[in-house]
Design a protein with these regions (language model features):
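PAPS-dependent sulfotransferase catalytic domain
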Residues: 1-102, 106-116
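PAPS-dependent sulfotransferase catalytic core
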Residues: 98-142
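Generic structural "secondary-structure junction" signal
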Residues: 19, 61, 75, 119, ...
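Positively charged interface segments
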Residues: 112, 147, 152
Length: 152
């Protein structure tokens, strides 16, 4: 095993955009601004996500990186966590490894101090953003969404 094992987990930019915006708003309401607190509206959040997508593009050409879709982790946690354990060359039967895997299992991590996990619902942007906003997102990220494996 090399000393550095890189795992890159990405999420549908539309859901990531909504999540970042809401996370920033909650932090401001609590009087503790964070890295997302400047996302005060749809346009600022959209500009922020453009950088997110460009970063995703750069990771696609890197070698020896495990790239995982967030949604795949939620929908098939067993397979994706096994893939991660294999990539990291860990013994998945060891209690300390199982403890970490089980601690991050969807539904288990909610509300844990220090974890950036609030709702984690797939496709929630469709419920929150207007049809016009969804159209802007489709126009803006359409090609990238397809490359990332998402439906427009």
């Amino acid at each position: 095993m090399s000393l550095l094992q890189i795992t890159y987990i990405y999420r549908d930019p539309r859901d990531a955009m909504l999540s970042a915006y809401e996370y920033g708003r909650r932090a401001l309401e609590k009087g503790r601004p964070n890295a997302f607190s400047h996302l005060s509206d749809f346009e600022k959040s959209l500009a922020f996500m453009e950088d997110y997508v460009r970063i995703w593009e750069k990771w696609q050409v890197e070698k020896n990186v495990l790239i995982v879709r967030y949604e795949d982790l939620l929908q098939d946690y067993e397979a994706e966590s096994a893939r991660l354990v294999g990539f990291l060359e860990l013994d998945g039967s060891k209690p300390e490894v199982r403890e970490v895997i089980d601690g991050y299992r969807p539904g288990q991590a909610e509300g844990q101090q220090g974890l950036h996990f609030y709702k984690g619902k797939i496709g929630r942007f469709r419920e929150v953003y207007s049809a016009e906003q969804q159209s802007v997102l489709a126009d803006h990220f359409g090609t990238d969404l397809e490359k990332m494996g998402y439906e427009i």
